[in-house]
């Protein structure tokens, strides 16, 4: 082997071997335990960044470790390839989205291969491939048939320049994230998936995912937002109409003094009197320009407008003015809030601003609240007052009694409410999966017959940058005969939200070549669920919740048998440099290509895994990268130095080992135990690598290396180092393994076996205290008696001064740990 470690030579050699031999190609094998490992697939933006390097290196360690442990590992890679950036690039660079996307995929694939990642590339998929999205169209039609896909009118975030719907996350300070135009609220017909049908199950199963971070589960529970309360009808004064309210605080009903409606509420204009109409319409227009997240923020100024109408509190008969309020949303509860300013902080601020009445109905223990003197709302449990027959009860006890009373009187009903809303999937963009629906003036909404699938996304479109979908302007796509009556009809021009594609890709990886449907049930049965999923915390709610929903929906459609897609979830931290997340705008980006060209992929991997535990942020350090390279060079030199002495002398004979050889073997097996536990149980790759580094130091220090009797111990030690390092740095370890005389690759060797007898310490370090204070430490044999421990302690030079000339009262011995000498 070469004397000097030259990463490029080593890495190019082994990458070529892996590719030619399809080393990581995998098929179903019932004789082996399966392990499905997956990192969230990337958007093909053009180049990988250091976040990708870290994320995929984490996954690769797990995959390689599991293979060494005898698992049949599925570790695929693909591309989340539809989406708006490709259209933006088409407009800016006069390049078709398909060309831009596939060129990016080709480059990024080459980058990932240079990292030495153990993917089964035969399973690669891109969501913009017809072979992928055609099956998604079939699933859509089946969901439509089951009532899980439907169309309705709803208010959406709308960018007038891009002419498309924006998710809440794409609205930044009231502006479009892409073009910075002011976002408005627009009423639009959209396609939805009925995720709310699964709200209860999605919530229930958060208790059945022990391998998920509690933080993510909490975020999902909050997003689903189950709450118990009542729906209460408030009659509108002078009308037969009623305003329906959902509340979890029916104990405060007697304190409701006004009504707040969402500006989008269907009764908003109906309740507006002629003299108030101009002001109300101006207010509604203003609120439409504010995104929902900002409207519900605690620090956002609460504003409203009086409609001119009143409703009646059904238990007090109080006249309640009806306001529109900017902080009330139509898609939570009923879009109407009974305002109790004394016991809700937002209502309190609103009431003070518009000089509305306050009525205390819950008093703190031993205190009397004066509405005029209140500086904040009282929101804790207390004693009911001004609440009719419920006076004197604790407010938490009164909740159930008031709910029963409302039901008995026909005023309200007990209700369970969910914050979760159905998933709007319509996007007014070109580069996405066409929704397979046709609109006929005679037949109405007509699903595309399965025999006519797929609806192919046409390539001959023009990108003008004017906004809206180019599909709308393509007559050859839009104008089609109705499948039912044959009359000319119009094709749907909206495409599906890209979250749809990422909600089932992990299932298609099980059978990417399956030509008879979206999913081969038998193969999915073998591989699913994903044993380990790895990705960023930013996907905690949307992607992960949608993927859970889709899995359950596909289960109910008969495609899969699992209830959940991902058994275990790791959310890795960010890569930061100079105190901030790496980004082009901050000028603190490290280019992986440059790093790999200079140091090699193994060094890049080792640093990204050693610098911090996976779930923590990684602080970039040039010195750390250099240190990782030096360590690999050091291991290389060590193998070179040991080649004349290893592989000779047969198996280790424990009985004939010298003390030093026994000590080295003890270090080897302690390291095997620690590294195994750190990878398998904790994903503490940084401490696993640190333990291997310590073992390398111990091998360097071991002498004499050239003694024939030490050959077996040195062989076991250096081979264990190479195998344990191989999941982290696969190229250099394959080269070293070959240099050590092995054929068939590291994986064929299997993970080193831990020998408990070899790891047992022959000596203990005993802490010696005198009158409870640390005065020394002594080393004794593991089989030393209590008397031998005492003798060693009394003879210790550091302990002697504290006991000489003093009366020994007693000595308390904790075996193997501590001796406390009590003197007087």
Curated annotation (Swiss-Prot):
**What Enzyme Commission number(s) appear in the record?**
6.1.1.4
What GO cellular-component annotations does this UniProt entry give?
cytosol
Q: Where does ATP bind?
A: 584
Q: Which InterPro entries match?
A: aa-tRNA-synth_I_CS, aa-tRNA-synth_Ia, Leu-tRNA-ligase, Leu_tRNA-synth_edit, M/V/L/I-tRNA-synth_anticd-bd, Methionyl/Leucyl_tRNA_Synth, Rossmann-like_a/b/a_fold, tRNAsynth_Ia_anticodon-bd
Q: Where in this protein would one find the motif 'KMSKS' region, according to its record?
A: 581-585
GO terms in the biological process aspect are: leucyl-tRNA aminoacylation
**Mind telling me which Pfam families this protein's record contains?**
Anticodon_1, tRNA-synt_1, tRNA-synt_1_2, tRNA-synt_1g
Which PROSITE patterns does the entry link to?
AA_TRNA_LIGASE_I (PS00178)
Enzyme class at the top of the EC tree: ligase
Which positions are tagged coiled coil?
A: none
The answer, when asked if Cell division is one of the entry's keywords, is no
Single GO MF descriptor? leucine-tRNA ligase activity
Keywords in alphabetical order? Aminoacyl-tRNA synthetase, ATP-binding, Cytoplasm, Ligase, Nucleotide-binding, Protein biosynthesis
Question: Gene3D superfamilies, per this entry?
Answer: 3.10.20.590, HUPs, Isoleucyl-tRNA Synthetase, Domain 1
Task: Say which family it is in.
Answer: Belongs to the class-I aminoacyl-tRNA synthetase family.
Q: What is this protein called?
A: Leucine--tRNA ligase
- Recorded source organism is Geobacter metallireducens (strain ATCC 53774 / DSM 7210 / GS-15)
């Amino acid at each position: 082997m070469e004397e000097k470690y030259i990463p490029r030579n080593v890495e190019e050699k082994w990458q070529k071997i892996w590719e030619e031999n399809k080393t990581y190609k995998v098929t179903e094998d019932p004789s082996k335990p399966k392990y499905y490992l997956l990192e969230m697939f990337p958007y093909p933006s053009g180049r990988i960044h250091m976040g990708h390097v870290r994320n995929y290196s984490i996954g690769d360690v797990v995959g390689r470790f599991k293979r060494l442990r005898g698992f049949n590992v599925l570790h695929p890679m693909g591309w989340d390839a539809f989406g708006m950036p490709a259209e933006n690039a088409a407009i800016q660079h006069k390049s078709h989205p398909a060309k831009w996307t596939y060129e990016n995929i080709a480059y990024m694939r080459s980058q990932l291969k240079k990292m030495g990642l153990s993917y089964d590339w035969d399973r690669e998929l891109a969501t913009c491939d017809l072979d992928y999205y055609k099956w998604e169209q079939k699933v859509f039609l089946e969901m439509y048939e089951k009532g899980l896909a439907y169309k309705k009118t709803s208010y959406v975030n709308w960018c007038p320049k891009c002419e498309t719907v924006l998710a809440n996350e794409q609205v930044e300070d009231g502006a479009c994230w892409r073009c910075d135009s002011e976002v408005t609220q627009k009423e639009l017909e959209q396609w939805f998936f009925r995720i709310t049908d699964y709200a209860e199950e999605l919530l229930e199963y958060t208790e059945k995912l022990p391998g998920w971070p509690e933080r993510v589960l909490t975020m999902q529970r909050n997003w689903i937002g189950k709450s118990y309360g009542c729906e209460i009808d408030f009659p509108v004064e002078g009308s037969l109409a009623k305003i329906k309210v959902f509340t979890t605080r029916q104990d405060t009903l007697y304190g409701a003094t006004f009504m707040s409606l969402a500006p989008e509420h269907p009764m908003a204009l109906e309740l507006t009197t002629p003299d108030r109409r101009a002001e109300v319409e101006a207010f509604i227009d203003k609120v439409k320009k504010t995104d929902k997240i900002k409207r519900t923020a605690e620090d956002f100024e609460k504003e409203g407008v009086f409609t001119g109408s009143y409703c009646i509190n059904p238990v007090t008969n109080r006249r309640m003015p009806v306001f529109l309020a900017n902080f009330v949303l139509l898609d939570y509860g009923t879009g109407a809030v009974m305002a109790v300013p004394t016991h809700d902080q937002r209502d309190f601020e609103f009431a003070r601003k518009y000089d509305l009445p306050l009525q205390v109905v819950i008093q703190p223990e031993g205190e009397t609240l004066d509405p005029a003197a209140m500086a904040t709302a009282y929101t804790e449990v207390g004693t009911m007052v001004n609440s009719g027959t419920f006076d004197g009860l604790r407010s938490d006890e009164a909740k159930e009694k008031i709910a029963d009373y409302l039901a008995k009187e026909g005023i309200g009903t007990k209700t369970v409410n969910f914050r979760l809303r159905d998933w709007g999937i319509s996007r007014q963009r070109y580069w996405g999966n066409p929704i397979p629906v046709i609109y006929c003036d005679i037949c109405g909404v007509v699903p595309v017959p399965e025999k006519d699938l797929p609806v192919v996304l046409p390539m001959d479109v023009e990108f003008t940058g004017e906004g809206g979908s180019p599909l709308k302007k393509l007559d050859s796509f839009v104008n089609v005969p109705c499948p039912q009556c044959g009359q000319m009809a119009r094709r749907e021009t909206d495409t599906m939200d890209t979250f749809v594609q990422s909600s089932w890709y992990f299932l298609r990886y099980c059978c990417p070549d399956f030509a008879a449907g979206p999913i081969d049930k038998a193969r999915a049965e073998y591989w699913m669920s994903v044993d380990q999923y790895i990705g960023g915390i930013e996907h905690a709610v949307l992607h992960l919740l949608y993927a859970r929903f889709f899995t359950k929906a596909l289960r109910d459609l008969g495609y899969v048998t699992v209830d959940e897609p991902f058994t275990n979830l790791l959310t890795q931290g960010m890569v930061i440099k100079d105190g901030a997340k790496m980004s082009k705008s901050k000028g603190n980006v490290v280019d992986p290509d440059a790093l790999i060209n200079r140091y090699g992929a193994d060094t890049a991997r080792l640093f990204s895994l050693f610098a911090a535990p996976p779930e923590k942020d990684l602080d970039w350090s040039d010195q750390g990268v250099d240190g990782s390279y030096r360590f690999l060079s050091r291991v290389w030199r060590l193998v070179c130095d040991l080649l004349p002495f290893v592989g000779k002398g047969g198996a280790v004979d424990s009985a004939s080992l010298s003390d030093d050889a026994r000590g080295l073997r003890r270090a080897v097996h302690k390291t095997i135990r620690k590294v195994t536990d750190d990878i398998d149980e904790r994903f503490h790759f940084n401490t696993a690598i640190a333990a291997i580094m310590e073992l390398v130091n111990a091998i360097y220090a071991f002498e004499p290396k050239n003694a024939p009797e030490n050959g077996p111990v040195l062989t076991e030690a250096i081979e264990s180092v190479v195998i344990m390092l191989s999941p982290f740095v696969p190229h250099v370890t394959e080269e070293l393994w070959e240099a050590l005389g092995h054929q068939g690759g590291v994986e064929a060797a299997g993970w080193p076996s831990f020998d408990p007898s070899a790891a047992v310490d022959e000596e203990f370090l005993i802490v010696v205290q005198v009158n409870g204070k640390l005065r020394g430490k002594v080393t004794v044999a593991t089989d030393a008696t209590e008397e031998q421990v005492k003798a060693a302690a009394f003879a210790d030079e550091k302990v002697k001064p504290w006991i000489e000339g003093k009366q020994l009262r007693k000595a308390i011995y904790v075996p193997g740990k501590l001796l406390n000498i009590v003197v007087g």
